[in-house]
Amino acid sequence: MQVSVETTQGLGRRVTITIAADSIETAVKSELVNVAKKVRIDGFRKGKVPMNIVAQRYGASVRQDVLGDLMSRNFIDAIIKEKINPAGAPTYVPGEYKLGEDFTYSVEFEVYPEVELQGLEAIEVEKPIVEVTDADVDGMLDTLRKQQATWKEKDGAVEAEDRVTIDFTGSVDSEEFEGGKASDFVLAMGQGRMIPGFEDGIKGHKAGEEFTIDVTFPEEYHAENLKGKAAKFAINLKKVEERELPELTAEFIKRFGVEDGSVEGLRAEVRKNMERELKSAIRNRVKSQAIEGLVKANDIDVPAALIDSEIDVLRRQAAQRFGGNEKQALELPRELFEEQAKRRVVVGLLLGEVIRTNELKADEERVKGLIEEMASAYEDPKEVIEFYSKNKELMDNMRNVALEEQAVEAVLAKAKVTEKETTFNELMNQQA
């Protein structure tokens, strides 16, 4: 076997291989012997068919199969010998085959980039320092009560957290526009659903009033014909409602799994959940900064084959989220996913190099801790832990999570990490 390797472009490679004629003939004869042992031909007992008849009937197809097998096996031998690491599936380009002559073919593919990590010491990471305070717990209890609130009609003026039912008609330069009209529209104030100024124009009014408000559509508004335009909305305020928050009764508290129904028990449960969320948020915040710094410090070429593969993964994930099938997924435009796919490949290659250079292996104690932390959010943590322990795929996934964490920690060990005090709400809003 003769082998030559050339670079086509960037990460592209072409391996040209020549297989000696005698190697081909030896392999063909060997395979014909195997065929002769199994074939049945009228007039001959099984395994007793003369070789010349076997060769006459099956020689062409056997030779084709043998060439395909030799091409594959010799390519594998060649990349092992040349220490080449292909990325993605190779493309075989067979040359012209002539009986009794050497056979030359080529294989085209991309290779993984050679990654030499740099700039780790210049990466800057800001680690949030946060405590869950009593005030944070109070705020979360208010949120829980608001989620369970009922609405009661009121006679007073509209306030910041009320709910209103309105008819409205919008116009620009005295002309109504598409999508600018609605009847019995229910609007919960303070959620930012409407354009700036709309809710402010309703506040202070009472049910039964009709009035006009002036607003300006944002420059980034989705409708091209309305961007930056001044508009008027004629409003008929039909109903105003205010929230009625439930009291922290034992019955209410038990809905959240606090069996004794006590306020103290609920506060303890809420605090525990908030601290778990906080731990995850801090970890994610630090991780995202470390990875962003790693990507910015290391500009690497990315094999197109890996990007294509990642795009297919993202397409299928998108289809699953929206109830589509695999055929529909593959029809989604690649432009929707290309940037995200490339970044995921880059991050994977860089973290892979961190793992390789630091000789990291998944820490089983960390894996156990991650599973326990995840399971603590469920009603029966022991059942979840046992389920994971019996599922190899889930355990492997969690080992990958642990290994990624260890890689990020290896980056942080060389980065410039500073601490900054912040609040629970500020951190959570950054995560949103």
From Swiss-Prot:
CC terms in the record's Gene Ontology section: cytoplasm
Gene Ontology biological process terms in this record: 'de novo' cotranslational protein folding; cell division; chaperone-mediated protein folding; protein transport; protein unfolding
Catalytic activity: [protein]-peptidylproline (omega=180) = [protein]-peptidylproline (omega=0)
E.C. numbers: 5.2.1.8
Keywords carried by this UniProt record: Cell cycle, Cell division, Chaperone, Cytoplasm, Isomerase, Rotamase
Domain observations: Consists of 3 domains; the N-terminus binds the ribosome, the middle domain has PPIase activity, while the C-terminus has intrinsic chaperone activity on its own.
Name of the protein this chain belongs to: Trigger factor
Protein source organism: Shigella boydii serotype 18 (strain CDC 3083-94 / BS512)
Taxonomy of the source species: Bacteria, Pseudomonadati, Pseudomonadota, Gammaproteobacteria, Enterobacterales
